[in-house]
Amino acid sequence: MSTSIQPNAPFRADIVGSFLRPQAVKDARAAYVAGKLDASGLKAVEDDAIRDLVAKQKAAGLQVITDGEFRRSYWHLDFMWGLNGIERRTSRTGYMFHDEETTADTAVVTGPISGENHPFVEHFKFVKALEGEGQVARQTIPAPIQTFSEVTLDRCDGQQESLRAVYKTDEELADAIAAAYRTVIADLYAAGCRNIQFDDCTWGIYCDTDFVAKTGMSPVDLQKVSELGVTLNNAAIADKPDDLVINTHVCRGNYHSTYAFEGGYDPIAPYLFAREDVDAFYLEFDTPRAGGFEPLKYVAPGKKVVLGLVTTKAAELEDEDAIVERIHEAAKYVPLENLYLSPQCGFASCEIGNKLTEDEQWAKIALVKRIAERVWK
């Protein structure tokens, strides 16, 4: 049990994936949207920023590298828009967070969904080429159930009518999404990807018992959507290659240092922790909003848990002793050798990013690294 080189994720000192966008990337994207910069010009700026980011990840001693999600506006929607049969539309409102609303975008089904020629495959190839010795390039994508949830909402006029013109039932839609994901995953694997991460806010919603109650969802309804989440996510990764590690990160919202949902993992643990066929769970535990560690007793034997005990929502550094103590508390439910440490989420799930500086961001990473070396000597 140590922090020495490991062949694949999770790593003792890990990350979720997104990083604060440099101003040059924000400016280039704004110029592109305004028609003042073409696609090749935008890509050149992104390429330079990603090279610099990967160099900083290496310098920080991370074994995993990502592109920081610098080529995206959102952690989830850009992937959905890259699927065949799904298009970008303006929604009536943005997503509602505590004290803040996001920009208004959504995803609409306009034809049969498939995963051929997804742009994220080319994005991954760029990062893969930057891997150093002992490093693993990670591709983050929204979980299949996240895509299902987005396209079945009613966030813009005609969204439901367009969906049902293509898929009459939820079962047909789920099958199509699972198949599309299998295609993208196979293409990523062929491009050399050995670590994929499903980012999943649907479970974070189901943790929020007050929000669930306000929607009128009954316990039976919650059971049905939880069953669907497990079934769809598992269908998307069925028959994956043995050397492809697929993990999942559960989030309660991470926009401009705000959150959307709260509540412990108790309602979802018997489904997510016990039955989802991923290798590891990256879980938020940075505030009391995430509840205690008791639901970890449902984690299937041999599965790994990455404890998100260091927040990305605030610059202040956590007390190292307190984090060490919490790791050992979690070890009452999952063996210490199956526990890992990371920030609770990314630093910029959307372009706007959280309210901290780049230096403060890297100080958080350094803190994770120090604590991991202390716990897993």
Question: What positions do the PLM features span?
Answer:
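Domain-level signal for soluble alpha/beta catalytic cores
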Residues: 1-377
